Structure formats: structure tokens, C-alpha cells
Regions:
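N-terminal pre-domain/capping segments
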Residues: 1-85, 91
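Active-site acidic/histidine proton-transfer and metal-coordination neighborhood
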Residues: 69-142
């Protein structure tokens, strides 16, 4: 299945899905305002998918203002909360996969420390999560 980022108007997305038989990759659940209103956001996106005419969905996890390898424990806690909210949205919407960013920035973190540090976050995050295929996306990694 090929997925197209839902970065266009819904009518344009519907035309693309209908013409090419694609699924949708949505960033809606990477946006904090949508996560703050999670139930309403899920209902709204469910309706969008219905109108667009597909149930094939990939979610892109939060990536702004969050960081799974942050030194600051409160930032990691906020990241965990946002990632869990996105995961819940994925469950309810039947997403095939959720894409998350690793948080690696070579200008801030040493690779050796980063790998050990971020592994702790991801082990905690994936504990008891078996319903989705989770993917880590490279942002700054080389």
C-alpha cells in the first residue's frame, strides 16, 4: 500500500485516494492541540476518513516540542504522554502503523550516550503495546 501525506485539503486528498488507491499518512495526531482534545479529534478524523473514502491510515507521531532522549525528565514525561495519546488515536482509528522520530540530534547528543538513553524511553513506551507496527523515523541521524 502506498500512503500519501494528508497535507492537502480534504477534497484534494479524496481525489488522490480515489485516483491512485492510496492510503493516508496523517500528521493530525502529532499536533498538541488535537491531542489536547483527543476524543473530539478522533471523531473528527474518523469522519474525514469516511468522507475521503479510505480506512488505510498511517499516523505520524508528535515531533514538535517533544524528545524521547531529552535530558530533562519533564520533557521525557511530556513526550511519553503525547506518544501514548497518538498511540491511542491509532488504536481507535485502526492505523496500520505509527511513525515516531527518534529525537537524535548529533549537535546535542553523543551517539553512545544517546543510544543507551533513548533505549530506556522506547522500552518503557512499547511495554504492553502489541497492537501496532511502530516505526522510528530519522530526522538528524547520519
Amino acid at each position: 500500500m502506498i500512503y500519501i501525506s494528508h497535507l492537502v485539503l480534504d477534497d484534494e486528498m479524496k481525489a488522490l485516494v480515489n485516483e491512485y488507491g492510496t492510503g493516508i499518512e496523517s500528521i493530525d495526531f502529532s499536533i498538541s492541540d488535537n491531542l489536547d482534545q483527543l476524543s473530539d479529534s478522533i471523531k473528527t478524523y474518523w469522519q474525514k476518513m469516511k468522507e475521503i473514502g479510505t480506512r488505510d491510515l498511517i499516523l505520524h507521531g508528535p515531533f514538535l516540542d517533544v524528545n524521547p532522549c531529552a535530558y530533562d525528565s519533564l520533557v521525557r514525561e511530556a513526550t511519553m504522554t503525547r506518544f501514548n495519546q497518538c498511540y491511542e488515536a491509532g488504536l481507535q482509528l485502526g492505523a496500520k502503523k505509527i511513525v515516531f522520530h527518534s529525537g537524535m540530534n548529533p549537535y546535542v547528543y553523543y551517539k553512545e550516550y544517546w543510544a543507551e538513553h533513548v533505549a530506556k524511553f522506547w522500552k518503557k513506551f512499547i511495554k504492553n503495546k502489541t497492537e501496532h507496527y511502530l516505526e522510528m523515523d530519522a530526522g538528524w541521524e547520519k
